Amino acid sequence: MKTSQNLVSVEQFSNQDVMAYLKLAQAFKNGKTVQLSQPTFAMNLFFENSTRTHTSFEMAERRLGLQVIPFDPKTSSVTKGESLLDTLKTIEAIGVNLAVVRHPRDRYYQPLLDAGFDMSLINAGDGSGQHPSQSLLDMLTIYEEFGHFDGLKIAIVGDLAHSRVARSNMALLTQLGAQVYFGGPKEWYGRDFEAYGEYQTMDQLVATMDVMMLLRVQHERLSQVNNQTFDASAYHQQYGLTAERAARMPKHAIIMHPAPVNRGVELASDLVEAPQSRIFQQMTNGVYIRMAMVASVLAHQGLISATQVEV
């Protein structure tokens, strides 16, 4: 596979790259192992709260044999005003080989790439911008279900305006040949989404989609913008995947959600564990996709031989 020193955006991925990551992730899922050429160190720097992404990156790193150095922004020199650039320069000087960063600022990574590092950087989410590891694990989940992307009808529904998952997935799904549709509050369907797919109501979407991908309503970002209040019950009735709507989905269709799930808001609580739900499979796949991403950047550094990431 083509290796990269840094993985920050789905814009880096050709279709061939995507399939290489999916195949390598499947190999790890089936028990593949790799050998590091020397002791290798990772640090996960999360400036936003996270359960799935943070934990699965650490699980991926440990499964690959890396030593994970803990980092807590609340007890770091960031609280003294140290910049993100200087923080990363510091950990590189100390000997860290891989930094995985989540940050609330869109494209936080650009000044870091411009500065240049020998260590690798993986973007674990930037503001409302990009979330490449989530996008790849979603591609893996869809590929495991259908075996292809071409012509699949996939609805992305919910808080589009604030979602890095929506932006990453709409670009990658369209590139791979899927047909993307959008749903949710119409005011969140902006011009940047119009180029990728049309808007439909929930009742229109559930009748024809192969995948219903629900997005969390991001209360924390809504309140930051304009102190909006939110009526969860009204949202669920108008834009949520209710049990009645789920019953009208095609028999082969699946439900996805990047989580955390607001049960009873984006979808009815019972649907989270329903037979057509792939939500927990997405979480499982997250470990193996992140193993593939970490292995790729380490192979670029020569810390894993290139032959070990070929499948």
UniProtKB/Swiss-Prot annotation:
ATP-binding among keywords: no
Pathway as given in its UniProt record: Pyrimidine metabolism; UMP biosynthesis via de novo pathway; (S)-dihydroorotate from bicarbonate: step 2/3
Disulfide bonds: none
Pfam families: OTCace, OTCace_N
Keywords: Pyrimidine biosynthesis, Transferase
Binding site for carbamoyl phosphate: 52-53, 102, 131, 134, 259-260
Catalyzed reactions: carbamoyl phosphate + L-aspartate = N-carbamoyl-L-aspartate + phosphate + H(+)
Keyword Transmembrane (UniProt): no
Role this protein plays: Catalyzes the condensation of carbamoyl phosphate and aspartate to form carbamoyl aspartate and inorganic phosphate, the committed step in the de novo pyrimidine nucleotide biosynthesis pathway.
Assembly, per entry: Heterododecamer (2C3:3R2) of six catalytic PyrB chains organized as two trimers (C3), and six regulatory PyrI chains organized as three dimers (R2).
NCBIfam families found in the cross-reference section: asp_carb_tr, PRK00856.1
Full protein name: Aspartate carbamoyltransferase catalytic subunit
Organism field: Lactiplantibacillus plantarum (strain ATCC BAA-793 / NCIMB 8826 / WCFS1) (Lactobacillus plantarum)
